């Protein structure tokens, strides 16, 4: 389960991987390579150390001159701990943990607001909150008898927002699922409750 407190930086940023919607398929090899690159980049022994004593160069009059050492503040890229890198790798390499992490991350990005206008800012990001009963329900054509719910989006996609029984079962504990439109960048939060005897 993902902790409610978000890390200093998101796990995709730590491993220098793209966070896309819908989530891009990342192979175990891609994750492992990104993990090793992050470890090498942020390893304390590999980091460029600024010497405590300045480097000396000799001038023509044999006086010692001091070179300015590289400014560490010039590189504004964050440094991550080994623990942060390991947590990112473990979360993104486990399909269940990654799905939960992605859900939390998408929700945070969609509903993030600033100051007193937080709710208003969240509204402007395109998150619409609806009940499952507000969507059209039909049986999927996969022969398994599974149901799907959909609703058109203002971008013109008649099935822009689509959720399946399997999606709802995964989020049964939360009673809500956040989905993005298939045709644009709008989001919808669907509220639902599992009936007795379901799941």
Curated annotation (Swiss-Prot):
A Pfam family assignment = Zn_ribbon_CSL
Q: Where does Zn(2+) bind?
A: 153, 155, 181, 184
Q: Does the keyword Metal-binding apply?
A: yes
> Keywords on this record?
Cytoplasm, Iron, Metal-binding, Nucleus, Zinc
**Basic and acidic residues composition-biased segments:** 58-74
Q: Which cysteines are joined by disulfide bonds?
A: none
Which Gene Ontology MF annotations are present? metal ion binding
Q: Which residues form the DPH-type MB domain?
A: 126-193
Enumerate the PROSITE patterns for this protein: DNAJ_2, DPH_MB
Biological pathway: Protein modification; peptidyl-diphthamide biosynthesis
Indicate where this protein resides in the cell.
Cytoplasm; Nucleus
Q: Where is this protein primarily located?
A: cytoplasm
Keyword Zinc present in the record's keywords: the answer is yes
Q: Give me the ranges of the annotated region Disordered.
A: 55-77
| InterPro entries reported for this sequence | DnaJ_domain, DPH3/4-like, DPH_MB_dom, DPH_MB_sf, J_dom_sf
Coiled coil stretches, renumbered: none
Q: Which domain of life is it from?
A: Eukaryota
Which one GO biological process term can you cite for this protein? Answer: protein histidyl modification to diphthamide
Query: Where do the J domain residues begin and end?
Result: 10-105
Instruction: List the GO cellular component terms.
Output: cytoplasm; nucleus
Identify its protein family.
Belongs to the DPH4 family.
**Role this protein plays:** Required for the first step of diphthamide biosynthesis, the transfer of 3-amino-3-carboxypropyl from S-adenosyl-L-methionine to a histidine residue. Diphthamide is a post-translational modification of histidine which occurs in elongation factor 2.
Share the domain note from the entry.
Answer: The DPH-type metal-binding (MB) domain can bind either zinc or iron ions.
Q: Which PANTHER family match?
A: DIPHTHAMIDE BIOSYNTHESIS PROTEIN 4, DPH3 HOMOLOG-RELATED
Name of the protein in its database record: Diphthamide biosynthesis protein 4
Native organism: Aspergillus fumigatus (strain ATCC MYA-4609 / CBS 101355 / FGSC A1100 / Af293)
**Gene that this polypeptide is encoded by:** dph4
């Amino acid at each position: 389960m993902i902790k409610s407190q978000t890390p200093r930086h998101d796990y995709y940023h730590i491993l220098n991987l793209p966070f896309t919607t819908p989530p891009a398929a990342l192979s175990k090899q891609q994750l492992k390579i990104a993990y090793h690159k992050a470890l090498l980049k942020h390893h304390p022994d590999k980091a460029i150390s600024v010497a405590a004593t300045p480097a000396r160069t000799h001038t023509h009059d044999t006086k010692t001159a001091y070179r300015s050492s590289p400014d560490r503040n010039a590189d504004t890229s964050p440094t991550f701990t080994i623990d942060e890198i390991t947590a990112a790798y473990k979360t993104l390499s486990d399909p269940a943990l990654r799905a939960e992490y992605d859900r939390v991350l998408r929700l945070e990005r969609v509903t993030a607001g600033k100051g007193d206008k937080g709710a208003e800012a969240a509204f402007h990001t395109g998150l619409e909150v609806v009940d499952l009963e507000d969507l059209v329900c039909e049986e999927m054509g996969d022969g398994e008898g599974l149901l799907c719910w959909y609703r058109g989006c203002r971008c013109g996609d008649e099935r822009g927002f689509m959720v399946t029984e399997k999606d709802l079962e995964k989020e049964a504990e939360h009673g809500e699922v956040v989905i993005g439109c298939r045709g644009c960048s709008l989001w919808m939060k669907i509220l639902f409750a599992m009936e007795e005897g379901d799941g």
